[in-house]
């Protein structure tokens, strides 16, 4: 990813490199203006991709093909969750694939995901 690159919404713009990181995808279509260091709320620094919105949204508001996740084995399902950058939104945004990996030793008949973790209005 470099300044001047065109991105589509949903395109991978940052790949997880460490155990507690997650893949990051572009929220909008546009042109990468710069990659710069930013300060996170907890005081850490990280690189950020600054995107100037330009072009058409080709995913937002459209029905996308469903993943046939029901036929995936546990390892493939964890890989899909990791590739999509799913993280918990609690106090510490832990990558969901890491949390699920911890419970892989036992057999799981039902998996319940709280899609609104820490939401005060629910």
Language-model regions, residue ranges each:
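Short, solvent-exposed loop/turn positions at domain surfaces
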Residues: 1, 18-21
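Short, well-structured beta-strand-loop connectors
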Residues: 2-15, 34
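Iron-sulfur-associated redox domains of electron-transfer enzymes in respiratory
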Residues: 21-122
């Amino acid at each position: 990813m470099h300044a001047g690159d065109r991105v589509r919404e949903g395109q991978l713009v940052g790949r997880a490199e460490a155990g507690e990181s997650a893949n990051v995808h572009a929220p909008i279509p546009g042109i990468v203006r710069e990659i710069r260091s930013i300060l996170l709320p907890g005081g850490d620094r990280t690189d950020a991709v600054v995107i100037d919105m330009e072009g058409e949204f080709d995913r937002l508001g459209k029905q996308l093909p469903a993943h046939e996740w029901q036929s995936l084995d546990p390892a493939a399902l964890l890989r899909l969750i990791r590739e999509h950058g799913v993280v918990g939104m609690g106090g510490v945004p832990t990558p969901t694939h890491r949390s699920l990996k911890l419970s892989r030793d036992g057999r799981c008949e039902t998996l319940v995901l709280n899609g609104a973790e820490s939401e005060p209005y629910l």
